[in-house]
Amino acid sequence: ATYKVKLVTPDGPVEFDCPDDVYILDQAEEEGHELPYSCRAGSCSSCAGKVKAGTVDQSDGNFLDDDQMADGFVLTCVAYPQSDVTIETHKEEDLTG
C-alpha cells in the first residue's frame, strides 16, 4: 500500500506518497526534501519528528523508549507509514530537551 505523508517542517509543509515498505526519510529525500539525519539506523535522535496524525511502524529503531513513542516521537529514518500520516520534523531538541 502507499500512503500520503505530510511533513510539517520549519520551511512549511510538504506532502508526498510513501509506500509502506519505504522509510519516510528515504522517500522524502527521493522527493527532494532535505531532512535532518545522522546514523540512518534508528540509533540516535537527529531525525526525530512527532506524529500528529496517523500511525507508523518504527520497530527497526532502538533509540526511543516506550514513553517517547507513546508521546508521538518518531525516528523518520526507520519509520514506515501504516496509514496516511502527518509528522512534525526537526524535533530533536524537544526529544532530548
Curated annotation (Swiss-Prot):
[2Fe-2S] cluster binds at residues 39, 44, 47, 77. The keyword Transmembrane does not apply. Keywords: 2Fe-2S, Chloroplast, Electron transport, Iron, Iron-sulfur, Metal-binding, Plastid, Transport. Its cofactor is [2Fe-2S] cluster. Binds 1 [2Fe-2S] cluster. Residues 3-93 form the 2Fe-2S ferredoxin-type domain. It is found in: Plastid, Chloroplast. It holds the Pfam family Fer2. CDD domains: fer2 (cd00207). InterPro entries: 2Fe-2S_ferredoxin-like_sf, 2Fe-2S_ferredoxin-type, 2Fe2S_fd_BS, Beta-grasp_dom_sf, Fd_pln. Its main location: plastid. GO terms for cellular component: chloroplast stroma. PROSITE patterns: 2FE2S_FER_1, 2FE2S_FER_2. GO terms for molecular function: 2 iron, 2 sulfur cluster binding; electron transfer activity; metal ion binding. GO terms for biological process: electron transport chain; ferredoxin metabolic process. PANTHER family: FERREDOXIN, FERREDOXIN-2, CHLOROPLASTIC. Belongs to the 2Fe2S plant-type ferredoxin family. Ferredoxins are iron-sulfur proteins that transfer electrons in a wide variety of metabolic reactions. This is Ferredoxin-2. It comes from Hyoscyamus niger (Black henbane).
